[in-house]
Amino acid sequence: MRLSDFDYDLPKELIAQKPVEPRDASRLMVVHRASGAIEHRCFRDLPEYLRPGDGLVINETRVMPARLLGSREQTGGAMEVLLLKRLDRDRWETLVKPGKKARPGERIVFGDGLLVGTVVGPTDYGGRVIDFHYEGVFENLLERLGQMPLPPYIHEQLEEPERYQTVYAREWGSAAAPTAGLHFTAELLDRLAARGVEIHRITLHVGLGTFRPVEVEDPTQHKMHSEFYHVSPEAAAGINAVRKGGGRLVAVGTTSVRTLETVADEDGTVRPGEGWTDIFIYPGYRFKAVDALVTNFHLPKSTLLMLVSALAGHDLIMRAYREAVAQRYRFFSFGDAMLIL
């Protein structure tokens, strides 16, 4: 397995810059693993492919406005801080621009002093650890001062920040959206429930490491980022009941896949709990819990493309991607969706 095995040609104009309206009007490519057949549908047709007793597992993380624009306390020079991972109550792993100015002890002021950050030191990946000082509730300050951190390949301003949140987002803490969930509307979720599909909620807070490129030709040598997950006892019990009843577990997004496969025993039993996962799923991996997947179209040479290749098979996925390009599907975070059965 080589990194180049996961490359494909993508015209830039197919990288979606804005989401479609309504959410479930996006296209849906249905990939059948057993037959290799590929269908072209609309996302609102999803209920036709799910059966009573199936379980849909959604990630209810909420994207935080993690981009902070501030200035150096000493000189007034502009600084940008991107929150990546909460290490302690007021200590964060961040990315800082310009990084050369972010030396230990440097103080960065945001919102006329409502929030002040002190650089503690560097991280392993070129970022900075920052301690924040403030009065009140940090989350409230961030909602007031922060901006939504859109992926680097989206160049247009987002008119409605809520369009980069799923309709079921609850648990504050992600630096990027679990984008497969962006296609769901409340009405579509109601239709699925009326069909007898069970909906189970888990949480994985998405870090910007999800956009970190693989830089080694042997992907197995890639160091995965770690992300925080939480699976409640209620969710675990419901998910296990789906499997015992003969239903399929349909993960919404690669984040749900990584969470389920982290907490599943060898026999597929899902255990409740929380912690950090750096699971890396690539071809050859044996899935323990996940039977099907709703996902978006991923970047060339990315760990997410490797994950979907592990589930559907490398050759079938690459054929599906070539067909998606030929059929002018929209790619990446605001793009169209794929259902792998």
Curated annotation (Swiss-Prot):
It comes from the Bacteria. Its EC number is 2.4.99.17. GO terms for biological process: queuosine biosynthetic process; tRNA wobble guanine modification. The keyword S-adenosyl-L-methionine applies. It holds the Pfam family Queuosine_synth. Keywords: Cytoplasm, Queuosine biosynthesis, S-adenosyl-L-methionine, Transferase. It is found in: Cytoplasm. PANTHER family: S-ADENOSYLMETHIONINE:TRNA RIBOSYLTRANSFERASE-ISOMERASE. Transfers and isomerizes the ribose moiety from AdoMet to the 7-aminomethyl group of 7-deazaguanine (preQ1-tRNA) to give epoxyqueuosine (oQ-tRNA). Belongs to the QueA family. Monomer. This is S-adenosylmethionine:tRNA ribosyltransferase-isomerase. It comes from Symbiobacterium thermophilum (strain DSM 24528 / JCM 14929 / IAM 14863 / T).
